[in-house]
């Protein structure tokens, strides 16, 4: 079973509480999503492999550690996942970025995939799938299905807020996936929104209704 981790760093929790407020502006919401994603990135990337390499400082030669050069890919679930990309890229600027586009059918609440655009070598990369919300879990499951069909195996899912229903669905469908979140909320309401949640992350990021 992959691990499930709530990242409870004080800065993340403080920023998340501001993010949740209904009067937080689009500009501020966008900035906060970016900042929280960056802070979460430190924990999500904790297990990246290191190797020893000899370098020369202004004083002497020395053996130090650096990333092994393992290939990374950040894959946002469109559209809200886009808001988390820059924060993670600030930590791993050489990462490739793929896109999986989905929308939620408002009657069935099920996700519908309309776009998959990925690096050609996606099967060789460590992948961070990002979406601010893990609500019903349908989009996350479908996105990871798409990645696995293309040979991807090393996948982590990163979200800001999650619901127990979505977590259960994702873990049952993909028990090998590590899941990182900043909060596990109470439940979903009858419309499939997380309670207390933060509303529609996509609308709040882009100023739409």
UniProtKB/Swiss-Prot annotation:
Binds 1 Mg(2+) ion per subunit. The magnesium is bound as Mg-PRPP. GO terms for biological process: UMP salvage; uracil salvage. 5-phospho-alpha-D-ribose 1-diphosphate binds at residues 79, 104, 131-139, 200. SUPFAM superfamilies: PRTase-like. Keywords: Allosteric enzyme, Glycosyltransferase, GTP-binding, Magnesium, Nucleotide-binding, Transferase. Catalyzes the conversion of uracil and 5-phospho-alpha-D-ribose 1-diphosphate (PRPP) to UMP and diphosphate. Uracil binds at residues 194, 199-201. It holds the Pfam family UPRTase. The keyword Transport does not apply. HAMAP family: Upp_B (MF_01218_B). It comes from Streptococcus mutans serotype c (strain ATCC 700610 / UA159). Its cofactor is Mg(2+). It catalyses: UMP + diphosphate = 5-phospho-alpha-D-ribose 1-diphosphate + uracil. This is Uracil phosphoribosyltransferase. PANTHER family: ADENINE PHOSPHORIBOSYLTRANSFERASE, URACIL PHOSPHORIBOSYLTRANSFERASE, CHLOROPLASTIC. Disulfide bonds: none annotated. Allosterically activated by GTP. Pathway: Pyrimidine metabolism; UMP biosynthesis via salvage pathway; UMP from uracil: step 1/1. GO terms for molecular function: GTP binding; magnesium ion binding; uracil phosphoribosyltransferase activity. Belongs to the UPRTase family. Its EC number is 2.4.2.9.
């Amino acid at each position: 079973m992959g691990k499930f981790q709530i990242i409870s760093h004080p800065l993340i929790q403080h920023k998340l509480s501001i993010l949740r407020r209904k009067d937080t502006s689009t500009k501020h919401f966008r900035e906060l999503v970016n900042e929280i994603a960056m802070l979460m990135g430190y924990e999500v990337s904790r297990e990246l492999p290191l190797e020893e390499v000899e370098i020369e400082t202004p004083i002497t030669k020395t053996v130090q550690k650096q990333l092994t050069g393992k290939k990374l890919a950040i894959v946002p679930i469109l559209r809200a996942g886009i808001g988390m990309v820059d924060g993670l890229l600030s930590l791993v600027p050489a990462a490739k970025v793929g896109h999986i586009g989905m929308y939620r059918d408002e009657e069935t609440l099920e996700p519908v995939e309309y776009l998959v655009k990925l690096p050609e070598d996606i099967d060789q990369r460590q992948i961070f799938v990002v979406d601010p919300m893990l609500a019903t879990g349908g989009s996350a499951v479908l996105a990871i299905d798409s990645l696995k069909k293309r040979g991807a195996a090393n996948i982590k899912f990163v979200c800001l807020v999650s619901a127990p229903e979505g977590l259960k669905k994702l873990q049952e469908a993909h028990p090998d996936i590590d899941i990182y979140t900043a909060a596990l909320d109470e439940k979903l309401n009858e419309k499939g929104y997380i309670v207390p949640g933060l509303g529609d992350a996509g609308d709040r990021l882009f100023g739409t209704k």
